[in-house]
């Protein structure tokens, strides 16, 4: 399966591939 987008992104960047920092400050699938 795909990596889960669940990390926080207070700096505006997500480490998980295919994830965007939206809605801030949580990463979600883009």
Curated annotation (Swiss-Prot):
Keyword check for Disulfide bond: yes
UniProt keyword Disulfide bond present: yes
Post-translational modification: This is a cyclic peptide.
InterPro entries from the UniProt entry: Cyclotide, Cyclotide_moebius_CS, Cyclotide_sf
Disulfide feature: 5-19, 9-21, 14-27
Keywords: Disulfide bond, Knottin, Plant defense
Chain positions of cross-link Cyclopeptide (Gly-Asn): 1-30
GO biological process annotation, one example: defense response
Family, similarity comment: Belongs to the cyclotide family. Moebius subfamily.
Physiological role: Probably participates in a plant defense mechanism.
Free-text domain note: The presence of a 'disulfide through disulfide knot' structurally defines this protein as a knottin.
Name of the protein in its database record: Varv peptide B
Organism of derivation: Viola arvensis (European field pansy)
């Amino acid at each position: 399966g795909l990596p889960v987008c669940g990390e926080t992104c207070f700096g505006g960047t997500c480490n998980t591939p295919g994830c965007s920092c939206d809605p801030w400050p949580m990463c979600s699938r883009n």
